[in-house]
From Swiss-Prot:
Record protein name field: Phosphatidylserine decarboxylase proenzyme
Post-translational modification note: Is synthesized initially as an inactive proenzyme. Formation of the active enzyme involves a self-maturation process in which the active site pyruvoyl group is generated from an internal serine residue via an autocatalytic post-translational modification. Two non-identical subunits are generated from the proenzyme in this reaction, and the pyruvate is formed at the N-terminus of the alpha chain, which is derived from the carboxyl end of the proenzyme.
GO molecular function: phosphatidylserine decarboxylase activity
Subunit structure comment from the entry: Heterodimer of a large membrane-associated beta subunit and a small pyruvoyl-containing alpha subunit.
Cofactor dependence: pyruvate
Length: 236
């Protein structure tokens, strides 16, 4: 019979571990906002206690808005996962952004619309190498409009998988969202489900997959970034 005993865990240690597993971490882009809100809260509280309460609520909201939940991507080969949390707005054939150099042949485009209440980080849809990253200035139309894909400010990224399959993911600014963050660079090796960017305050993300791919979602369906399988990819 084994006489080994499991190490004891103090209630405080258990509580800290539970909080770490329950409360999602915050994306680095949100730290200046949270810090600014916290400082403002402390200053205002000295003048009026009620302002301190409101400031505390604002600080908590900023931290919640920039949350970056832990996600586990499917391990299947030959699939593309959702690049963002949100609602599928469109599934259609469309020519990818010209700046990616993919030519004029249509690909299948799946558009995911994010409201202000959704998680606003973007996830890598396919493991592989980043072969192109291109930013283009544009308008700030409402992200749920069809022409937002063509007219709005955007940041496009092209990824080539190990088998040569290429997918593109495009961050699109919206009526309120006017700040696109992309941490990926050309030549980077990226993993499906990992965070690569963020769009502030409501936006849209377009995923382009090979035209003959089998799309597994439909308009109106909710997606979970890094986990929902968007399509089974046609081989290169």
């Amino acid at each position: 019979m084994s006489t080994e005993q499991e190490p004891k865990t103090s209630p405080l240690t258990h509580l800290v571990a539970l909080a770490r597993d329950t409360v999602p971490p915050m994306h680095p882009a949100g730290r200046p906002f949270v810090l600014g809100a916290a400082v403002a809260t402390l200053l205002l509280r000295r003048r009026w206690r009620g302002a301190g309460v409101l400031g505390g609520i604002l600080t908590a909201w900023c931290a919640w808005f920039f949350r970056e939940p832990r996600r586990t991507a499917p391990t299947r080969d030959g699939i593309a996962v959702a690049p963002a949390d949100g609602t599928v707005a469109h599934v259609e054939k469309a020519v990818p952004p010209a700046e990616l150099g993919l030519g004029a042949a249509p690909m299948t485009r799946v558009s995911v619309f994010l409201t202000i209440f959704d998680v606003h980080v973007q996830r890598v849809p396919l493991s592989g190498e980043v072969t192109k990253v291109s930013y283009r200035a544009g308008k700030f139309l409402s992200a749920d409009l069809d022409k937002a894909s063509e007219d709005n400010e955007r940041n496009s990224m092209l990824i080539r998988g190990a088998d040569g399959t290429e997918v593109a993911v495009v961050q699109i600014a919206g009526l309120v969202a006017r700040r696109i963050v992309c941490s990926a660079s050309e030549g980077d090796q990226v993993l499906a489900g990992h965070t690569y960017g963020l769009i502030r305050f409501g936006s849209r993300v377009d995923l382009y997959v090979p035209a003959d791919s089998r799309v597994l979602v439909e308009p109106g369906q909710r997606t979970i970034g890094g986990e929902t399988v968007i399509a089974e990819l046609a081989r290169a």
